[in-house]
């Protein structure tokens, strides 16, 4: 919390999972939005439902509070939806026509992608495969109880070595850091009728992470 953006004071925990919550751990990437006087917290967490024993079961949930400082409570006892793969980094856009869109990042986990870079990495003896995270978008129901239609892929790491974006978006691989390429942390906004999306690439724990 801050006062006049100069003096800061530590706030309390605003959301805490419990034994009956759908999310178990690794609560991740919160974003809070005010709508009609209430505050909605979108976040990622590992889903309790894990019949295959996966290491990552991230899904996106939403909690609600009457104050931006919480406490927040789950709006539903389940994730917003289940795309069939782990997802993080929820971002929400309300369009001028009232429709609501959810953007998220598919995790790299169990998502190997064959590309010119993966062939290069294999030839160099760096990595056998390259896993990637991609940004998707999908329309969301106004009450956040689910989605409308199927998610659409909006952003991926460059697949061609000749793509001018490949250099900076692939440094985690070319530097031998890790066998993954990220497109994550998306933020969508609209300005003068045009839609823009910011995002982050490269290993979030490495020196090449960038926007």
Features from the language model and the residues they span:
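Carbohydrate-active catalytic/glycan-binding domains of CAZyme proteins
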Residues: 3-211
């Amino acid at each position: 919390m801050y006062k006049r953006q100069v003096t800061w004071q530590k706030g309390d925990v605003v959301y805490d999972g419990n034994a009956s919550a759908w999310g178990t751990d690794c609560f991740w990437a919160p974003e809070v939005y005010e709508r009609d006087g209430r505050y909605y917290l979108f976040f990622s967490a590992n889903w309790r439902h894990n019949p295959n024993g996966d290491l990552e079961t991230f899904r996106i949930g939403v909690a609600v509070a009457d104050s931006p400082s919480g406490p927040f409570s789950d709006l539903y006892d389940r994730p917003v939806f289940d795309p069939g793969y782990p997802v993080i980094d929820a971002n929400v856009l309300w369009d001028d026509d009232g429709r609501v869109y959810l953007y998220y990042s598919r995790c790299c986990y169990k998502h190997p992608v064959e590309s010119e870079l993966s062939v290069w990495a294999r030839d160099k003896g760096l990595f056998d495969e390259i896993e990637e995270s991609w940004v998707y978008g999908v329309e969301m129901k106004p009450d956040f109880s689910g989605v409308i239609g199927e998610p659409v892929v909006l952003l991926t790491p460059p697949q061609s070595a000749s793509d001018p974006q490949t250099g900076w978006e692939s440094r985690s691989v070319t530097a031998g850091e890790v066998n993954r390429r990220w497109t994550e942390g998306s933020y969508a906004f609209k300005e003068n009728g045009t839609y823009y999306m910011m995002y982050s690439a490269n290993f979030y724990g490495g020196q090449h992470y960038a926007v």
